[in-house]
Each structure stands twice: as C-alpha cells, then as structure tokens.
Amino acid sequence: MSVKLEGVELRRIAMPLVSPFRTSFGTQTARDILLLRAVTSDGEGWGECVAMSDPLYSSEYVDATADVLRRFFLPTLAASTEELQRHGAHAVNAVLHKFKGHRMAKAALQMAVLDAELRADGRSWARELGAVHERVPSGVSVGIFDSIPQLLDVVGSYLDAGYVRIKLKIEPGWDVEPVRAVRERFGDDVPLQVDANTAYTLRDARHLAKLDDFDLLLIEQPLEEEDILGHAELARLIKTPVCLDESIVSAQSAAAAISVGACSIINIKPGRVGGYLEAVRIHDVAAAHGLAVWCGGMVETGLGRAANAALAALPGFTLPGDISASDRFYRTDITAPLTISEGYMDVPAGPGLGVSPIPELLDAVTTSSEWITL
C-alpha cells in the first residue's frame, strides 16, 4: 500500500516507573520516551522509540534519536515520496540505509508509518507480521535487588500474578546465590532464565558454569556485544544455553552468530534491530537454522507492548517473552492497559497496532511536542 506522508510529530513523554528497575548497567526510576505520530493523507500512526536517556544499553539515547530524525531521517523521507508511494512503510529503512546505525530511531519511524498504513487499510499488526496465535505467554523481567529476601518477595508476587516465566537480571556478585535462592524457594518447575547485559568476560566462564546446576532456560548476553567468538567459546564451556541480545542487530548479524555457534537462542528486540520488519527476518533466519527465539522488552508503553505481543505470536517464538502487563512498569499507561490472564496476553486484533494513546493520559505525561511538515 502506498503512503503519502504529510508530517511527523515528535512527542516526548516522561513515564515514572512503579518501582526502580536495576540492571547491570544502571537503575531506572522513570522513562524519557520519544513517540512519533506519522500523519498521512489517509490517517495517522504511532511509533515508539526504545532508546534510553543515556547511552548505557546501546550507543543510542533519546536526545540523539530526536536529533537524527529531525536533521536527517525526516528530510530524507520528504525527498523520497515516490518510494513511499510505491512501497509504503517497507521503503522507510531502504531509503534511510545510507545513514549508519541509529536503528532505534529508524525502527520508531518505520513503526509509525506502518501503523498509519495498516490502520488506513484495516489490517492488523499481527496479520502484517505473520502471527499465528491469538494470545502469547507472558514472562517478566526482575531487576537486581539489595537483598535476596526482597528478590524472593518480588518473584513470588509475579508468580502469584500468573507470569509463566521469570527472568533474573544478574551481574558479578549477584548471580549464583540469587538463582539458587529462587530455585530453593519456588522449585525446579518454574521456567527461569538470567540476563547479564554484557556484565561478564570469558575469564568468568568457570564461575558462570556454576549456573549449570539450576536448569536454566538460558543465560542472556553474558559477554560484550561485539565478542561473538567469546560467546561461541563460552557456549562450549557451559551447559546453560547461551542467548544473544545486544549482539544481534540485524538478520545478517544473527546468521553470523549462528554460523560460529555463538548462541542457540536469540532475543529479538525490534527497536534494537531497526524495526519489526527486520525482526521478522531474524525470526526467519533463526527458524531456518532450528533456533528458538523470544521477544524481549524495553520498558515500552502500551504502543510498543501491543506491537511486541503481535511479533511474539509468530510461529518461531517458542519461548515466553518479556510481554508483561502494563502495570509491571507503569501505574498508568498512555493506552488502555494491556493485561494478562492465566499467564497469557491477548494479541490486539484491531487495525494497525490495535491500541491508541488516550489523549488525556498522553497529555498528562507530555513534556514537549514538535511538528515537522514533510
């Protein structure tokens, strides 16, 4: 479907978290989020940029994404009307390919244009991506705490809420003992995995092998994102399956990592890889090689959460993702809250994302807004 893009609104919002979320690279108490509203001749669509306030998870950060959109991406789209009219949202990343990196900014822009296109055509996000399930299992990510009793209380509350999989954030000094405590308290039947966010080196292999005793689903991104060969060596030294997150930025990088044995599982985060269309390609590459994938989260609002649920409904997503309910991170979301029932979240079935910002809720958290005519 063709798209005639008239302009894009860049809207910044400030979303306080219900509780601090600590990982190996820092602690978040609020999210500074850039939203994009793409206006076309047929309607509008929404995109959410997952870049954080500081370049800690990746090299991108929210001020930089707004800048690159304003100075480079949007003017380039404005000069590419023929491609957009011919190929719609599928042309966005092709048009922007000459610009190096900035995948989170590209993903947000593609998301907004695709949402507008699908809403105008009456098609759902899930149908466009190739979803085969109407609901998806919901896992939850649990941060680092000051004490093990705190951790156990939080894990227990999430299990009581129905989450079907627990992911523990780990770092040196907070790894084996927290995992041991969770296993001892809640048993071996709870699907459990850990996420290091690049906090270790290959010299820690013997220590990480101690996690083999706990029958974990996986250990996620233990080493630096560029250390593909190190991950391949680690995978040979430990029994716990190695999953890559930060290292996977495209279908090409996924194929390369798979070819050297650096992982047996991939966490697909659409923002990290340049958008949902590239996320589908990574899913296809993994499926062709017999690897499981799952959908990671970036503390999204209901917009990104709905899109992720649709992605997680593709056939190759065989492990529960970080598709948690809105109230996991936000007391009040900007959309109608996404909820879980008996451990599952329904995949939105309406046109486009299937959810929209509620104007009064969006206005209440908006810190700035800029309209750019194309």
Task: Please place each PLM-identified region on the residue numbering.
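A generic structural signal for well-ordered alpha-helical segments
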Residues: E117-L118, A235, A286, A312
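Catalytic core of soluble alpha/beta enzymes
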Residues: L168, G173-G304, D333, I340
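Hydrophobic alpha-helix feature that most strongly marks membrane-spanning transmembrane helices
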Residues: A287, L291, A307, A313-G316, ...
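Structural signal for conserved beta-strand scaffold positions within catalytic alpha/beta enzyme cores
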Residues: V140, N267, D322-A325
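N-terminal capping/lid subdomain adjacent to the active-site entrance of alpha/beta enzymes
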Residues: S2-Q193, N197-L202, R206, K210-D213, ...
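Short amphipathic alpha-helical face segments that pack within enzyme cores
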Residues: A108, A112, R281, G302-A310
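Active-site pocket-lining/capping segments in soluble small-molecule metabolic enzymes
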Residues: V299-E342, G350-G352
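Short, solvent-exposed coil/turn elements at secondary-structure transition points
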Residues: R11-I13, I144, I248, G271, ...
